[in-house]
Design a protein with these regions (language model features):
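Metabolite-binding pocket within alpha/beta catalytic cores that recognizes anionic/polar moieties
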Residues: 2-40, 48-150
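Conserved small/polar residues in nucleotide/adenosyl-binding loops
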Residues: 162-163
Length: 163
């Protein structure tokens, strides 16, 4: 084994409410009627091409999967994503663990995002009690019912919000 084995007894989960979160949902959530940011011609061409491919796929009854990283949620595009799903443009989603963490934290606490540099240095990065507890509780409960990660966590977020 390379390095030192982690002593799990030394990990002390901390209350999420005490974390200095860097963004609130109100600060980052992009309204559906917001004016799109200006982008260059090359990028706009890529967006147009992608939109055309999505339209063609859906017109032909094909599935469209969107695979995205945490920054989509972290930077406030949740309503846009929800709208694409609700209107049938996207049929499947895939993200990483950080994407689901931001989604859950915004829904539960109304804020998310921590300073990686500071919190890694203090050994507190990712040690937030409620985030770990409730996401894993949702996954366990959903797993018992035969649900996958996304369905189980989505049900938990939609039906068991703190507020």
């Amino acid at each position: 084994m390379i390095g030192t084995k982690i002593d799990l007894q030394k990990i002390k989960p901390l209350p999420l409410a005490k974390r200095n979160s860097l963004s609130t949902v109100e600060e980052v959530l992009v309204p559906l009627d917001a004016e799109p940011a200006a982008i260059g011609d090359a990028l706009m061409s890529q967006v147009d091409d992608c939109a055309g491919r999505i339209r063609k796929a859906r017109a032909n009854g094909k599935a469209v999967m969107m695979i995205y990283g945490a920054h989509l949620i972290k930077n406030g595009a949740a309503l846009i994503l929800d709208n694409l799903i609700a209107n049938g443009w996207l049929s499947h989603l895939a993200t990483n663990g950080a994407g689901t963490i931001h989604d859950w934290e915004y829904a539960w606490l109304g804020r998310s995002t921590e300073c990686v540099r500071s919190n890694v240095a203090t050994g507190t990065f990712g040690t937030w009690e409620e985030t770990g507890r409730y996401i894993h509780l949702a996954l366990l409960a959903g797993g018992v019912e035969g649900m996958g990660y996304g369905e189980a966590l989505g049900r938990f977020i939609a039906g068991d919000r703190k507020s």
